[in-house]
Amino acid sequence: MKRALQTSFIIWTILSALVLASVIVIYLRNGETGLNLFIQQWPLSNLTVTLEATAYTWLCAGAILYLLVNDKVNAENAFFVAGFFIVILLYLNVLRERFRYGDYQYYLEAATALMNNQPLPDTYLYLPLWATLLQFIVPLGDQGMLAILWTVNIIMLGSFYILLVRVLEHYGYSNRFAVIIAVLFMSINTPLHRSLGYVQVNLIAMVLIMASLLTFRKNDLVSALLLALAVHLKTSPAALALAFLLERNWKWLAWFALTFILIALIPVALEGTRPYFDYLTNINILTHITDTNFHDTSFDSFFRFFNPFLGINLEATRLITMGAKALLGLAAIYVMAQNIRSHTFVSRETQNHILLNAIPSLFIVMTLTSPIVWDHHGIFTTLAFLLLLHCIETPALWMWFGFAYFLEFILPSFDFFPWSFGRLIAPLIVLCLMWYVTRSKQSPSLLVSANRWFENLKFQISQ
């Protein structure tokens, strides 16, 4: 087996060298025109994405062979490695079939505006850091920016898988059980699919958040910097700072404040303060939208739908929306306190148990209090859902959890009021379940049983 693998890897290396050499020779002799003679764009395909997906799939094949040849895969990590490549190869093939990508064009417009010393367009709803950084690749054009951001998202996809497994392990899941959950979760996942399909910044922000959670107290500077970056990319992760604050790690808080300010100064140094005022203007514009977008499953969009039917003016709707979000915030804080008190997710003996028990409910606040909640924002509720798996025991609770999970992650995106607002209801159901399980005295038998079963599962890697 080892000899066959070595031969396969040598063949892969030779073929890779031949492909690379052919591209170089064709380009040097005939330029881009010459490449066009050998490469065709199929209808309903994006050539940039097609070539990237093909190249990365080929590199994955080489990486698998390299790991096997060098005995890097063993009985301890085979689940983890296999899960990684299953997820990556699945999405490389799925995303290759998509020929139109969305939100990166908003980023391109914003970056172009900054480069031309113009105000940020009203379609850009983030702090100015992202647009400030992207302006340096604007000269590459539309397809050049798509190529870079598409690659970044594939890297973030792999990082998301790795960090999700590590976070679940942090909460007591065995490695194999965590891998199975991560692979199943990522394989059928509407918010994840749409985040990648729109080349969205959400996946980057979620990776930064999970990395910040894992590095807390191990390296306070890195942890604080990662969360500060997430806030500058998406703003809403600021809600998670409360969980870190409850740990009373003043060193971490000082680093967070300092790094947040230093990052904020990057756009100021390059563009002045105007982009921040543009951001505030764009957020204010959101509060004056009068119609409902059924893709936007926020409280704002939901209540605006009733305005023409009930004769409610926009100001009254804004007050109702603010009231609903305030109630959600209070409910989440109450549930968070109960989770900390009852050690819902981790025991008192676990390091950083306050942070780990507090943060799941805050992901729901972070998601639903935003003025716009698109389908892909559901990726931010990942841990709120998955960490409940070992807390629920009764059939009734499983039915409620399954219903919420179906609405949030499995149901395709569609526009049909009020049924398409299931992604507004699903996190609220999970918040209620977080509260309900604090009343239960049952031990997490599912987690214990699943961990034991997967750890006792034995197999051998042939050499």
Set out the residue ranges of the language-model regions.
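Primarily membrane-embedded glycan-assembly and transfer machineries that use lipid-linked glycans
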Residues: 4-222, 247-376, 382, 386, ...
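Transmembrane helices and adjacent periplasmic/lumenal helix-loop junctions
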Residues: 227-244, 370-377
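Interfacial aromatic-anchored transmembrane helix boundaries in multi-pass membrane proteins
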Residues: 243, 269, 417-419
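Aromatic-enriched
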Residues: 22, 26-53, 387-457, 463
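Short alpha-helical segments used as structural interaction elements across diverse proteins
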Residues: 231, 322, 373-374, 420, ...
